[in-house]
Amino acid sequence: MMNDSFCRIIAGEIQARPEQVDAAVRLLDEGNTVPFIARYRKEITGGLDDTQLRNLETRLSYLRELEERRQAILKSISEQGKLTDDLAKAINATLSKTELEDLYLPYKPKRRTRGQIAIEAGLEPLADLLWSDPSHTPEVAAAQYVYADKGVADTKAALDGARYILMERFAEDAALLAKVRDYLWKNAHLVSTVVSGKEEEGAKFRDYFDHHEPLSTVPSHRALAMFRGRNEGVLQLSLNADPQFDEPPKESYCEQIIMDHLGLRLNNAPADSWRKGVVSWTWRIKVLMHLETELMGTVRERAEDEAINVFARNLHDLLMAAPAGLRATMGLDPGLRTGVKVAVVDATGKLVATDTIYPHTGQAAKAAMTVAALCEKHNVELVAIGNGTASRETERFYLDVQKQFPKVTAQKVIVSEAGASVYSASELAAQEFPDLDVSLRGAVSIARRLQDPLAELVKIDPKSIGVGQYQHDVSQTQLARKLDAVVEDCVNAVGVDLNTASVPLLTRVAGLTRMMAQNIVAWRDENGQFQNRQQLLKVSRLGPKAFEQCAGFLRINHGDNPLDASTVHPEAYPVVERILAATQQALKDLMGNSSELRNLKASDFTDEKFGVPTVTDIIKELEKPGRDPRPEFKTAQFADGVETMNDLQPGMILEGAVTNVTNFGAFVDIGVHQDGLVHISSLSNKFVEDPHTVVKAGDIVKVKVLEVDLQRKRIALTMRLDEQPGETNARRGGGNERPQNNRPAAKPRGREAQPAGNSAMMDALAAAMGKKR
């Protein structure tokens, strides 16, 4: 069951109605997959798409964890005999894990603290006396509480003990913590300084050696860069609660917040100085340390979430890149001393030939003859060249082959080889090619990923594809969960050929486990090709529920029923039968008949189970059966004579392929072995909030070279072709830093966060985001 308040919360967050959320949760709890629900249960969910469902799934998990923790806390406090009606009401009302833990803090079992020791020593009456009645002189009052046998040796020890009691009491006040937390989040700065003596060793973090910026607005890439610097022992991070002052003040404004909350008024009474000291201790020793850790954790969590989302978007774009299709392809895995590895696959992706050539070590003529012979023998239409070391040299070699052998007409394409080496050494590659040398397997992968990027890349751990922003600095569990969802959604959006798909590809189909995928391939090997979807039920361990989830995403071309090659689910075949009866046409005549299908009204074919959304989808599918949602295949043409960074000149206009998109811009491969950066401010003449709205991985773009830094291996590019090299770095058309409103401007202290212009001298994260070779 789903809590009604949870339904309302999630509905507001995903722009849906509570009843839609409730219906989706029921479907998920029944074991239905997100791709299945999104495509085949639109009537029940009101048309929630896969993105909404994924967000719902994530938020639902959080809220259920919250509820489980809430019940555990209520039980714990109740067993202590301290659960009041007001406390129970507050605990039941909160929807934040942080607030929940704040409420539990005073009752949470903990090690003996100094405050507890002081209470055991009988000092609580002293603490209450001095706090409530400041007319008492602290030293005089404390003299009555000196108990040497209890560890209270003198009045100073008694007063310190009383301070600890009050400090711990106030630091566990949930309402007080909420006020200070809110102030810090809105006003504090995150401060980064270099650890003394680490300047040279940590040079890549030098932009953060003396840096501060508002805590709540620090971009994810800068936050993760600073956290990485701290983890490597180069940077120290802290919070400045009072950034409006040049130097840290003697008293923080947070101390005033604490005093106001506690109703403390100072009137020069004998105990006022001591009480002021209690407030100072509460802030500096307890609250600041607690909230600094917590808020930095919040910043890191937000930064990690953004980084994971960036990775997910880039992975989605890479997986959904245009396939070259059923064309015989040669894969060239470039190398210098070790040679260029060659693999030829036929139109179906089957490996038909391999070789190793040495065009860069004095054997170019022999290598050219080998390539030409393979191209002619196997009717090669495309040549995929890996983009790693010696890529441009290998590309130039192939162009020479075409000049020498006019019959070699296969189009060359530079292909990202990220992850190819990981695949080569994997258990899966060993199973596919047990007798093939590891070094040649990479060439096979390069060829196949040009034919069908999705089918080949699913064989590789997404984290090895290298299109992520600080992917090694984030929660690997959350990253894996997110990326698995992306792969699943992409595979099911495209659909899978049941008779040719590999085990890794089948494993990503909704409802199928790895064991089921293996059993499908085993059944196929033993019985030949599937002729209809119903034969899936003959596969071991694939029962009715799994069939329901997977059948619509599995295609059978040239089988018994043309509908088996479409996205129409077998459960909806009766709807098609009604359409055929109404149009008095045979299925093969109706499929693709746009003029006939566009005259149909979806509402004429609905029933209790299938409403207008599903029938509309069926009619669209009949019009264009088996349509591929991926774009048309296009390639970037790198400029002749531009092969290394030394060949680049400011002002050059080049064509390139977007390899990676981050929150601060896009990296573009222009064929010089080092991706250039188009900063967010140079993506468009209009303001750009999110680079992903302008470009995506795989896009072919025209760029102008603005700056080349050979020493740091930085290339600054712009997609605003009217932008001139050397122009000011001030933001003109975009960027993601906005003015701070509703708060006094902080005076500079050290280096403030600067709007990073489109300079090759970006901070260290440009290196981290560079192409993985």
Curated annotation (Swiss-Prot):
Entry keywords, A to Z: RNA-binding
Chain ranges passing through the membrane: none
S1 motif domain residues: 651-720
GO terms (BP aspect): nucleobase-containing compound metabolic process; response to ionizing radiation; translation
Pfam families: HHH_3 (PF12836), HHH_9 (PF17674), S1 (PF00575), Tex_central_region (PF22706), Tex_N (PF09371), Tex_YqgF (PF16921)
Segments of this protein annotated with the region Disordered: 721-773
Record flagged with keyword RNA-binding: yes
InterPro entries associated with the record: HHH_9, NA-bd_OB-fold, Ribos_protein_bS1-like, RNaseH-like_sf, RuvA_2-like, S1_domain, S1_Tex, Tex-like_central_region
GO molecular function, one term: tRNA binding
Name this protein carries in UniProt: Protein YhgF
The organism of origin for this protein: Escherichia coli (strain K12)
Gene behind this protein: yhgF
